[in-house]
């Protein structure tokens, strides 16, 4: 856990609950706006999509890039964050 970003460490420190999507590591302000505009305003909704994709990081990353304009780096960070959260809490 030493090489984790502070944002990732904070996200993994507790259940998702009602956290806004901007709490997810990898979600920039601009990407959060794009997600919220299309109805994904909570972290648990984004996690739900990740789970619907069977935790397939490559597929999830393509979805973020194609549908919401995420950069490759944002998509990778976000999928890694959700994968790590699943490992801790599911």
Swiss-Prot record:
Ranges in a coiled coil: none
Compartments (UniProt record): Nucleus; Cytoplasm
Parts of the chain that traverse the membrane: none
Pfam families on file: SAM_BAF (PF02961)
Tissues expressing the protein: Expressed strongly in testis and pancreas. Also detected in brain, colon, liver, lung, ovary, placenta, prostate, small intestine, spleen and thymus. Not detected in heart, kidney and skeletal muscle.
Any one Gene Ontology cellular component term annotated for this protein: condensed chromosome
GO molecular function, one term: DNA binding
Highest taxon of source: Eukaryota
Keywords: Cytoplasm, Nucleus
GO terms for biological process, alphabetical: chromosome organization
InterPro entries, alphabetized: BAF (IPR051387), BAF_prot (IPR004122), BAF_sf (IPR036617)
UniProt similarity note: Belongs to the BAF family.
Record's subunit section: Homodimer. Heterodimerizes with BANF1.
Role of this protein: May play a role in BANF1 regulation and influence tissue-specific roles of BANF1.
Protein known as: Barrier-to-autointegration factor-like protein
The encoding gene: BANF2
